[in-house]
Swiss-Prot record:
Originating organism: Methanosphaera stadtmanae (strain ATCC 43021 / DSM 3091 / JCM 11832 / MCB-3)
Disulfide links within the chain: none
Protein name per its UniProtKB record: Large ribosomal subunit protein uL1
Coiled coil: none
NCBIfam families: PRK04203.1
């Protein structure tokens, strides 16, 4: 399977016209025999890509004191303190804008009740509620992991779509990333990857190539 995927990635890159930006590579997977009316079949999983996403990820860190300082030093895109949380709670348009602008949210454990109160209504429906972490956590480690993480979800159709890399990565690197997704499907689908009906790859602006 890995060789088949590598060949498909090569074809996708060859058929994609040069652009003035680095294009992402996306995978689309359709699934057989998945009753999405059953909540347990609506996949919502995080996948750590071994070679990274190939694209920047925006991460907001909700913390106070030393943890907030460390998060800022580690390169968090935004650090939100308790005072800012309360301000966002009074400004729903700004809170929605924040929710749409960031890929991941992380929050100091003892701030989670405040987060739930002020940001829960906008983050919850977007499946972006923060991961709680203790004040002693290492922000650099957390940020590094999240920058290589994607979310795969099945909502109202038995389809998964996600970024798996960028055109400046090698075929092998993209294939390894897709293998990581396949591993998650193997663990979460009743019949594993045998339930995959079809898989497609494409660059941001390029044509679609069928893999299987």
């Amino acid at each position: 399977m890995t060789q088949v995927i590598e060949e498909a990635v090569k074809k996708v890159l060859e058929e994609s016209k040069p652009r003035n930006f680095t294009q992402s590579i996306d995978v689309v997977i359709t699934i057989n025999d998945l009753d999405i009316n059953k909540p347990e079949n609506r996949l919502d999983e995080e996948v750590l890509l071994p070679n990274g996403r190939g694209k920047d990820v925006k991460i907001a860190f909700i913390a106070e004191g030393e943890l907030a300082y460390q998060a800022e030093q580690a390169g968090a895109d935004l650090v939100i303190n308790k005072e800012k949380l309360e301000e966002l709670g009074k400004n729903r348009p700004e809170a929605k804008k924040l929710a749409n602008s960031y890929d991941f949210f992380v929050a100091q454990t003892d701030l989670m009740p405040t987060v739930g109160r002020f940001l829960g209504p906008v983050l919850g429906p977007r499946k972006k509620m923060p991961k709680p972490i203790p004040a002693s956590a290492n922000p650099e480690t957390i940020l590094g992991r999240l920058r290589s993480t994607i979310k795969i979800r099945v909502k109202d159709q038995p389809i998964i779509q996600s970024i798996v890399g960028s055109e400046d990565m090698t075929e092998a690197q993209v294939a390894e990333n897709i293998d990581a997704i396949m591993d998650v499907l193997d663990r979460n689908l009743e019949k594993g990857s045998k339930q995959i009906k079809a898989m497609y790859l494409k660059t941001t602006m390029g044509p679609v190539t069928r893999v299987i």
